[in-house]
Amino acid sequence: MKDGTDLILETTIAFLQIYIVLILLRMSLGWFPNINWYSQPFYSLSQLSDPYLNLFHGVFPSFLGIDFSPIIGITLIDFIIELLSRQLKPL
């Protein structure tokens, strides 16, 4: 039987995994220049992902027009997921 701590950890891990998918979607859609980021659902996607990604802008300079902030952001989230997964109690 799982206790409350495991439930909180599993919910947090699931949220972080969904957030990684949102970042990947935002990153993939960035290659399409005709997308209007002020129309729905693109506006909501950018409002959810851009504040986090902006934390990492400028950490590494762009190379050949490629922004590395999503890679840094996803790596950090993945590291946090790994730390939280280790705290889960085995069944």
From Swiss-Prot:
Q: Key word Plastid present in the record?
A: yes
Q: Among the entry's GO cellular component annotations, what is one?
A: chloroplast
Keywords of the record: Chloroplast, Plastid
For this UniProt entry, what is the primary localization, expressed as one broad class? plastid
Instruction: Name residues in a coiled coil.
Output: none
Q: Which GO terms describe its biological process?
A: chloroplast fission; nucleoid organization
Q: Specify the domain of life of the species encoding this protein.
A: Eukaryota
Give the protein name, as stated in the record: Uncharacterized protein ycf19
Lineage, broadest ranks: Eukaryota, Rhodophyta, Bangiophyceae, Cyanidiales, Cyanidiaceae
